[in-house]
Design a protein with these regions (language model features):
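Hydrophobic, well-ordered secondary-structure elements that form the walls
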Residues: 44, 102, 127, 137, ...
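Short connector loops/turns at beta-strand edges and beta->alpha or beta->beta junctions
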Residues: 35-36, 133, 139-142
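Midchain, well-structured core segments that form catalytic/ion-binding scaffolds
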Residues: 1-56, 66
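Active-site-adjacent substrate-binding region
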Residues: 8-18, 28-29, 76, 84-134
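His/Asp/Glu-rich mid-to-C-terminal helical/loop segments that flank catalytic regions of hydrolases
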Residues: 1-17, 53, 60-64, 104, ...
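Active-site proximal loops enriched in glycine and acidic residues that flank catalytic Cys/His/Asp
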Residues: 32, 44-48, 58, 81-83, ...
């Protein structure tokens, strides 16, 4: 547990954390710490908008771990990186009609469409890399993944209207 604590204490301060970055800045974020005196596990999420920066963040995390382990010569650690979410833009750019249709559906449902990047991972990213280009559209939700997460009935209705319009657009263009 001491080693895990030292690893956490030596993560970059003032940069590369969700609370100190914004927009298209990536981050390294510990999500779970479990352990006892003989074994500890730390789970992180690493997010960024390019594969190169994701690799840089993973290398930085490995460097922190390696540096800390030098202080504990009789200990060992492993770092396992599992791909979770990548930037779906590279897939969506190959299928521009998918985004165009979504934007049109939003307009048809009576709203002004805007395009934004999000910093979290989404199912749309996984689906896009599995061969089903899938941009994120709005749900109307607020304060995602927190105890105050909510969505209004009116926003849910607009989401449903958008989805109906989207299905109609795909049928019209088929």
């Amino acid at each position: 547990m001491k080693i895990a604590g030292d690893i956490l204490a030596n993560l970059p301060i003032g940069r590369l954390s969700p609370e100190t970055t914004s927009g298209k800045q990536g981050f390294i974020h510990p999500t779970t710490v479990e352990g006892s005196s003989e074994k500890a596990v730390i789970r992180f999420i690493i997010r960024d908008f390019t594969d190169e920066k994701l690799n840089d963040h993973a290398a930085e995390l490995r460097a922190v771990m390696d540096t800390i382990l030098k202080r504990y010569p009789n200990s060992k650690a492993t770092l396992e990186i599992k791909e979770q979410y990548r930037n779906m833009k590279k897939i969506l750019d190959k299928h521009p009609q998918v985004v165009d249709y979504a934007l049109e559906a939003i307009e048809r449902a009576g709203m002004k469409a805007t395009r934004n990047s999000i910093r979290g991972g989404t199912d749309g990213s996984r689906l896009s890399f599995m061969g089903l280009p899938c941009p994120n559209i709005f749900t109307g939700g607020h304060a995602f993944h927190g105890p105050q997460e909510w969505v209004s009935r009116q926003d849910m209705e607009k989401t449903v209207q958008t989805l109906v319009e989207l299905v109609q657009i795909w049928e019209e263009r088929a």
